[in-house]
Amino acid sequence: VRLFGVEPERIEVVIHRQSIIHSMVEYIDNTVIAQLGLPDMRSAVRYALTFPGRTEVRSAGLDFASVGTLTFDRPDEKAFPLLNAGREAYKMGGTALCSLIAADERAVGEFIAGNIGFGDISRAVFAALDKVKVYGISEESIYEARREADEVCSEIIKNM
């Protein structure tokens, strides 16, 4: 399964610290269309829940004059060690990305709870990914992959 049928080599990651642009697509004529919004996840979640429709929002929208400059940087692979793991999981296919996300959610939760350090997040996720199985895609396999990755990552963190 490929995101919009796009091969992983064609997906570019950039760091956009203002969090205004949520996605961009470059077309064959080199033009780019971007989805912009306030820097929180409420609009993305709302859209996912109401797709294919849209719901009216009565709060203030994006004020472009206040935003100012939009900046982009190439990711520092050392600062974002799980970025390459995401690329590799995408290439693997099956439930690999699901397992990565589940392990990351567990590790980040443990970091937020104060149980592990920031650097332990990637160590726990990498260790969990080395131990979990990758299944073909089905509704059952997605739930199984999430459960397994969560359990394995929890056990790894307990032993850190």
Regions found by a protein language model. Name each.
Residues 1-160:
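Catalytic, metal-anchored helix/loop core of enzyme active sites in primary metabolism
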